[in-house]
Amino acid sequence: MVKRYGCAGILLFAMGLFPLLAQDNAAAKEMAIKIADRIVASTVYEFKDVKTGKVYTSLDNVSLNPDMRVNSKYLNWHYTNGVTNMALMELGDKIQNRKYEDYVLKNMKFIFDKTNQSYFHRLYDKTFREGGWRAVPRLTWHMIYRNKRLDDNGPMGASLITLNQRHPDDALSKNILKQPIIILWFQNLVWPMEP
């Protein structure tokens, strides 16, 4: 798990160095940008059947398959990716470069693409019906649909709300309205909306 999300941790650490090491600000900034650029460059927008290895760029007309996964760890709906999204947007704000915010927007649009959501929501419903709660955690984006714990939508929901405030989008707004009120309250507490 540490290796899997190490880049996000390093990015957050590097960003934390900005104010602490004013004399070495250039090095911290350079490191944060290097890590962020690696994250952006390594993200692929496709799906993979982990059993057969077959890669799909679209889920149109693909049969429901519990072995289908998003093929980039940065597109998983996971706590660490929500934190990474917020860090990338903050980095973009600090260096006045929209590249990282545009990356997060592209990721969210991919996740909330109508075809992608339809596929994984139907797969979630089918898997839950057949196997209950214990069967769903292995599915891509199961946390979006399970929506029972703060970690299911906390940081990802916060990054989604922040992004949607900057780039209003019907597909993103639709998902925000599904979030539990506690998530919206927490997000507003941590990242208050402008008056």
Give the predicted meaning of each segment.
Residues 4, 167-177, 191-194:
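Short secondary-structure capping/junction motifs at helix and strand boundaries
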Residues 77, 148, 194:
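Flexible, active-site-adjacent loop/turn segments at secondary-structure boundaries
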